[in-house]
Each structure stands twice: as structure tokens, then as C-alpha cells.
Design a protein with these regions (language model features):
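Feature captures the catalytic cores and cofactor-binding loops of soluble hydro-lyases/lyases
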Residues: 1-160
Length: 165
């Protein structure tokens, strides 16, 4: 049986999904309340496109090339999942990459790090879940160059293609 993702997005809610997953024996499938949406009404639903950020200590010649190459691989309807491995010294997501994800028709972003340009993200009505805010750019601080590999966010294992809600 096929389901319309957009229809399910409006019919389901996180509590019932957690109850069902618990009943199936998957008891650690919810991200904690440390990661929140920009707007409380925001719902994202779609397959995960995973990536990992690594802390760096020097400014590369072309600092955004690696992340641009990763985002360019994002497919329509996918959720851009970015794990920072506890690197909270900068924002790893903002208006520039929101524009890129939106252009690729990504369904939203889930990151365990910081975001910036929040006013612009709100004006774009861009669905993003994040840990907090930080005005500092990721250039020379964090590089995203690994993608479509299994990741762990907030203790929850996420594989490429896993559905995020």
C-alpha cells in the first residue's frame, strides 16, 4: 500500500509515532527536546540525507566548497540531517544553505548544532530543527564533507533513507 507523504505529515504526530515504535521494540527513536524547530508548528517528514560536520582549525582556500558539494546531492523531499559531533563553536546552517536546500526541493533540515540568520529563515518559512543559535560562520571552524553514511544524533541512529518525522 502506498501513502502520500504530504497527507501523512498532516495526519500523524510525534507522540503516536513514539508509541508505535516503542510497541515494536524501538525505544530510542526520538530526538530529545534539546533540538527544536524554528517555529513551533513546524513538521518535517521525509527520508534522511545524512551528513557529518568535522571541526577544523584553519580557513581552507574555498571554505564552503565541501558543504556545497554535499548539499548538491540532496534529493527532492529529503531531510538534510547534519550531525556536528558536539562541535558547537559556530553555526553550521543559515540562510545560504537554506536557500540551497530549498532550491534542491529538500523537505527541511535536522541538525544537532547551531543555526544563524534566524530572521531570514523565518521569512523563508524554512523548516529547520536545531540545537541553538550562534552568529559565527562555519568557515574555518567546521567542514561538512561526509554524507550518506549512518550517523547518530542525540543517541538516535539515523541511516540514509530512514524516515524523519
Amino acid at each position: 500500500m502506498k501513502y502520500d507523504v504530504n497527507e501523512l505529515k498532516h495526519q500523524l504526530y510525534s507522540g503516536i509515532l513514539c508509541d508505535v515504535m516503542d510497541g515494536m521494540g524501538y525505544r530510542n527513536q526520538a530526538i530529545s527536546n534539546k533540538i527544536n524547530p524554528l517555529n513551533d508548528e513546524t513538521v518535517i517528514f521525509g527520508p534522511a540525507f545524512t551528513s557529518i560536520g568535522t571541526e577544523v582549525y584553519s580557513m581552507p582556500e574555498d571554505p564552503l566548497t565541501a558543504q556545497c558539494k554535499v548539499v548538491d546531492q540532496l534529493g527532492e523531499g529529503e531531510i538534510y540531517v547534519l550531525v556536528t559531533r558536539g562541535n558547537y563553536n559556530c553555526a553550521v546552517f543559515g540562510e545560504l544553505f537554506a536557500t540551497a536546500v530549498k532550491a534542491r526541493k529538500g523537505a527541511g533540515v535536522l541538525l544537532d548544532g547551531y543555526a544563524r540568520d534566524l530572521k531570514a529563515l523565518k521569512e523563508m518559512d524554512f523548516p529547520v530543527f536545531f540545537r541553538g543559535k550562534n552568529p559565527k560562520t562555519s568557515k574555518g571552524r567546521c567542514e561538512i564533507n561526509e554524507c550518506q553514511i549512518p550517523v547518530t544524533m542525540d543517541g538516535v541512529a539515523i541511516r540514509p533513507g530512514d524516515y524523519i518525522f
